[in-house]
Amino acid sequence: MNKFNFQNLKKPFIIAEMSGNHNHSLERALQIVDAAAESGVDALKLQTYTADTLTIDKSDGEFFISDPNNLWKGESLYSLYQKAYTPWEWHKAIFDRCKEKGIVCFSTPFDFTAVDFLEELDCPIYKIASFENIDIPLIKRVAQTGKPMIVSTGMASLSELDDLVRTAKENGCQDLTLLKCTSSYPATPEGTNLLTIPHMKELFKCNVGLSDHTLGIGAAVASVALGATVIEKHFTLSRADGGVDAAFSMEPAEMAQLVRECNTACEALGEVSYEIQEQEKKSIVFRRSLYIVEDMKAGDRITEKNMRSIRPGLGLKPKYYNAVLGKKVVHDIKKGTKLTWDIIENFI
């Protein structure tokens, strides 16, 4: 797993983000692993933190979520993170289940202690969350592991992105993927701005993907057409079960559809080609071509009445229609005869 390389991807790398959708049940967490693997994803991602590594136990002022439009309104930051965190003692069991099911398991560390803990589990990839993409010391510490890094870019300015990319590369990261991300839960299609993906790829000379908080699969599939190589979506067994992130998470059948359609989009990109494809050759016969549509005698002239451009495509191409109008035929012709040069006077 330590040799995983995002430079060698042949298809989109699809990540199911468990986040807090385990609802504080290890059994449910393992069921999420099983369902994710069954849906065809490449990886399952955890988040490694505690409420105390993210904030302080304070429930007023700026530590309280009062925005009526916020998904987590009425919570303090501390109480929210207590509900959402994945107990560290579960990590090994989840990593082991992922290995058993044939998918990659990795995590997002939120402080140095989480990095140290994940290194003991031989975590093969590290993710930096959007809210931490300005935490340069953390980015530096993760880069120093030498593992591939994925960084969500939500809320980051261009200069902040430059800071994080430089920090990662200067501290040993040779395999960096930036994820276009809109840090809104859920995100709207009009606020997703997928056209940033090819620009970001060109600007920072690295792989680019999408951390997708929109509902449905449309944005993810479209991102593949724009060059996204990594797709991350939150994942749960059922939104009806509730949970801190359930409202914008994919269910198993939806994730399976996302995997299929992203792979189809990738295959369909192909290459720039104006050649007849091998699979098209049998269809050539059904193109239009010039045919005689009335019985004709030798010496009769070709007219708009006795010649038409019709299917099938075995006669002269329609572009010769005007060139042969008024020309004589050299022998009797039956209705339904394809027009060829050898039956036209002066074209033999």
Locations of regions flagged by a protein language model:
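Catalytic cores and adjacent flexible loops of soluble metabolic enzymes
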Residues: 1-348
